[in-house]
Curated annotation (Swiss-Prot):
Coiled coil: none annotated. It comes from Lactobacillus acidophilus (strain ATCC 700396 / NCK56 / N2 / NCFM). Belongs to the UPF0297 family. This is UPF0297 protein LBA0418. It comes from the Bacteria. InterPro entries: IreB (IPR009309). It holds the Pfam family IreB.
């Protein structure tokens, strides 16, 4: 059987890289280093979807764009409610 006849398995989560928590920590630190209010900037990004709220400093913008906004919000709600399962 050739490799073209085999079904490949793709695991989306395996290729994600950093988890949401680590990404938010890095973005928060980058915003602080640039003198911004990190909470306001992250909330602005999550509400608007405009990546201009996140600086390119320390690759923060590219890091946060690797996650969907709804995924970030879901993780924040789970964390807030203590439902990190």
């Amino acid at each position: 059987m050739s490799s073209l006849d085999k079904t490949m398995h793709f695991d989306f989560n395996q290729n994600k890289g950093k988890n949401v928590y680590d990404t938010l920590q890095d973005v928060y630190n980058a915003l602080e280093e640039k003198g911004y209010n990190p909470i306001n900037q992250i909330v602005g990004y999550l509400l608007s979807g405009d990546p201009a709220y996140i600086p390119r400093h320390n690759d923060a913008r590219n890091l946060i764009l690797k996650h969907e906004r709804d995924e970030i919000i879901e993780e924040l709600v789970k964390s807030y409610l203590g439902k990190n399962k």
